[in-house]
Amino acid sequence: MGTRDDEYDYLFKVVLIGDSGVGKSNLLSRFTRNEFNLESKSTIGVEFATRSIQVDGKTIKAQIWDTAGQERYRAITSAYYRGAVGALLVYDIAKHLTYENVERWLKELRDHADSNIVIMLVGNKSDLRHLRAVPTDEARAFAEKNNLSFIETSALDSTNVEEAFKNILTEIYRIVSQKQIADRAAHDESPGNNVVDISVPPTTDGQRPNKLQCCQSL
């Protein structure tokens, strides 16, 4: 029998990218398990966790993938990005080099991910305000220039972690919903599973959303 965690209307794959040590793993654990590990070690390979939220009465299940930031693990790039509909591009507000590398990560994302992927720039470790090396206005301007949403977070004290994930998931949901509406208006309704992809309008049956709607293929 299925568990309550199996009951969802949409499944969205969201990836965490950015330099090693910026706090990607702790953002993941804070959002999915409300945990923070001061002694967390660098991720080796790939891991993911899930959490469901409600948006407009729909259950959105987020499958959030975390990967190592080190170059020696970048061979997994293609599989990591496959099917992702959202990305959190994370830097450390107290380490300017991690912000400088955002441009390289953004290029990698553009090269390997779907062209319609929703991207949020995340300045993590906002609790280290006394060590700030990246001005908020500078990062916000970069995000606007590159059509990214922007937020500063602290996985340590939980500041804006919920908001970051919920905002990007809601934005993805809005895009998917608009595509469903447009597709419904443009095509005759036909039976079949609803497989949602933000780059390809889904087929809908006009009935109750299929439990296994999803936005990613593993």
From Swiss-Prot:
Motif range (Switch 1): 36-47
Modified positions (Cysteine methyl ester) in chain numbering: 215
A GO biological-process term: endocytic recycling
Record's keyword terms, sorted: Acetylation, Citrullination, Cytoplasmic vesicle, Endosome, GTP-binding, Hydrolase, Lipoprotein, Magnesium, Membrane, Metal-binding, Methylation, Nucleotide-binding, Prenylation, Protein transport, Synapse, Transport
Listed cofactors: Mg(2+)
Motif mapping: Switch 2: 67-86
Binding of Mg(2+), residues: 25, 43, 66
GO molecular function: G protein activity; GDP binding; GTP binding; GTPase activity; myosin V binding
A matching Pfam family: Ras
Spans annotated as Disordered: 184-218
Regulation of activity: Regulated by guanine nucleotide exchange factors (GEFs) which promote the exchange of bound GDP for free GTP. Regulated by GTPase activating proteins (GAPs) which increase the GTP hydrolysis activity. Inhibited by GDP dissociation inhibitors (GDIs) which prevent Rab-GDP dissociation.
Keyword Membrane: yes
Subcellular localization: Recycling endosome membrane; Cytoplasmic vesicle, Secretory vesicle, Synaptic vesicle membrane; Cytoplasmic vesicle, Phagosome membrane; Cytoplasmic vesicle
PROSITE patterns: RAB
Removed propeptide positions: 216-218
Tissue: Abundantly expressed in brain, heart and testis. Also detected in kidney and pancreatic islets.
Gene Ontology CC terms: cytoplasm; cytoplasmic vesicle; mitochondrion; phagocytic vesicle; phagocytic vesicle membrane; recycling endosome; recycling endosome membrane; synaptic vesicle
Modified residues (Citrulline): 4
Residues where lipid is bound covalently (S-geranylgeranyl cysteine): 214-215
NCBIfam families named in the record: small_GTP
Summary of the function given for this chain in its UniProt record: The small GTPases Rab are key regulators of intracellular membrane trafficking, from the formation of transport vesicles to their fusion with membranes. Rabs cycle between an inactive GDP-bound form and an active GTP-bound form that is able to recruit to membranes different set of downstream effectors directly responsible for vesicle formation, movement, tethering and fusion.
Similarity comment: Belongs to the small GTPase superfamily. Rab family.
Record-given protein name: Ras-related protein Rab-11B
Lineage: Eukaryota, Metazoa, Chordata, Craniata, Vertebrata
